[in-house]
C-alpha cells in the first residue's frame, strides 16, 4: 500500500504547479510549490515540525508539554496540528489585527489563543516579545516542559527548508531551476531554500519579494533598514534581520505593491482555479520580475504559501478592497441571471 504514517509524514513533498498565464506572459516556466497542500494548509508546517523535533531532541519538551509562539497565524496552525499529533499543547499569541479566519482555525486546531494589540517590534509588548516572556513564565510551572518556538530566530526553521523544500525543488526540476523567489516573514523559507539550491549550483538566482511596509528591500539594496508604504498582506514583511536571515544568499530584491500582486491572485483563481493568499501574490509578482530580468527560457520557482480562503474577509471582500483603494475583480460581485425552474 502507498500511505503516509500519520500527519507528520504528510508534511512536505508538495507538487510543483506550472503557472500557465504568467509563464506565457514572460516566456519562462514559472512554477509554484503547492505548500497549501500540507496538512495545516501552509508552508509553515515544515518550520513547525523542525522546531518541535529540535526541542524534543534537546530534552526541552516531553509529552504533555507546551509550545508557545507569537505568530500571525500559519505557524501557530502548524504548531498546533503537529503538537496534537505528538502529544503537546499549544499557546499562540497573535496580533488582534490578523484575519478572523486564521483566529478561528487556530481555535479549531485546539490552540489556546491570546490576542494582543498590534505594535512594532521595538515595543516591549510586541506579540513576539510577549510570547517569549510567556514561555519563560510557563517553563517555571509546566512539569513536562514549555518551549518558545521563536520561529523568527530559531534556525531549526531555516534548517527545515535546507533539508526538505530546497532539495525537493532541485529534484522536481531535475536540477534545472534557474531562480527562486519568495517573500520573508521569519526568513526561514527564503534563506533555507536559497542555501540548499546555492549548495547545488551557485548560479541559481535567489530573489526577495518584499511587500510595501517592510524594510528588507531597502536593506538588500542600500544596506539600511527602512520601510515605506503599507500592505494588506499578512504573515510577511520584516523590519529586521532575523537569525534565520543571517547569511541568506540573496542576489536581488524587489519591492512589490499590493496593486501589482492582487491582480495576479485574482487572475490565478479566475483562470487557473488556484485560490491563494496575499503573500503568494507578492511571491508570484516577484517571480514575474525575475523572469523578465533573466529573459525567456528560464525556470523560476516560487512558493504558493497558503489558501486564499484564510483571508476571505479581507482579500476577497469588495468593500475592504475599495476602502484600501485596491482593484476589485468583476467576478467577485457577479450576480446570477439564471432563472430558477421552480415547480
Residue ranges: model-predicted function:
Residues 1-343:
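PLP-dependent amino-acid enzyme catalytic core
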Amino acid at each position: 500500500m502507498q500511505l503516509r504514517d500519520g500527519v507528520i509524514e504528510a508534511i512536505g513533498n508538495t507538487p510543483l504547479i506550472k503557472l500557465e498565464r504568467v509563464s506565457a506572459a514572460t516566456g519562462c516556466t514559472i512554477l509554484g510549490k503547492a505548500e497549501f497542500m500540507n496538512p495545516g494548509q501552509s508552508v509553515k508546517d515544515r518550520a513547525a515540525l523542525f522546531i518541535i523535533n529540535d526541542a524534543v531532541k534537546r530534552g526541552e519538551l516531553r509529552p504533555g508539554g507546551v509550545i508557545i509562539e507569537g505568530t500571525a497565524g500559519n505557524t501557530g496552525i502548524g504548531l498546533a496540528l503537529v503538537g496534537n499529533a505528538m502529544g503537546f499543547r499549544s499557546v499562540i499569541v497573535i496580533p488582534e489585527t490578523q484575519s478572523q479566519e486564521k483566529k478561528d482555525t487556530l481555535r479549531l486546531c485546539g490552540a489556546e489563543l491570546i490576542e494582543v494589540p498590534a505594535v512594532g517590534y521595538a515595543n516591549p509588548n510586541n506579540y513576539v516579545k510577549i510570547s517569549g516572556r510567556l514561555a519563560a513564565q510557563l517553563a517555571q510551572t509546566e512539569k513536562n516542559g514549555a518551549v518558545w518556538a521563536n520561529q523568527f530566530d530559531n534556525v531549526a526553521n531555516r534548517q527545515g527548508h535546507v533539508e526538505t523544500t530546497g532539495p525537493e525543488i532541485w529534484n522536481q526540476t531535475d536540477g534545472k531551476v534557474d531562480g527562486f523567489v519568495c517573500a520573508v516573514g521569519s526568513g526561514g523559507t527564503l534563506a533555507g531554500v536559497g542555501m540548499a539550491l546555492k549548495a547545488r549550483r551557485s548560479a541559481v538566482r535567489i530573489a526577495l519579494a518584499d511587500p510595501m511596509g517592510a524594510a528588507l528591500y531597502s536593506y538588500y539594496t542600500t544596506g539600511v533598514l527602512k520601510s515605506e508604504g503599507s500592505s494588506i498582506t499578512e504573515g510577511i514583511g520584516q523590519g529586521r534581520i532575523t537569525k534565520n536571515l543571517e547569511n541568506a544568499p540573496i542576489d536581488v530584491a524587489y519591492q512589490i505593491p499590493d496593486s501589482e500582486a492582487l491582480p495576479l491572485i485574482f487572475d490565478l483563481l479566475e483562470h487557473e482555479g488556484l485560490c491563494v493568499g496575499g503573500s503568494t501574490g507578492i511571491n508570484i509578482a516577484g517571480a514575474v520580475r525575475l523572469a523578465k530580468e533573466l529573459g525567456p527560457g528560464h525556470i523560476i520557482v516560487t512558493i504558493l504559501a497558503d489558501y486564499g480562503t484564510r483571508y476571505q474577509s479581507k482579500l476577497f471582500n469588495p468593500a475592504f478592497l475599495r476602502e484600501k483603494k485596491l482593484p476589485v475583480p468583476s467576478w467577485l460581485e457577479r450576480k446570477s441571471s439564471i432563472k430558477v425552474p421552480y415547480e
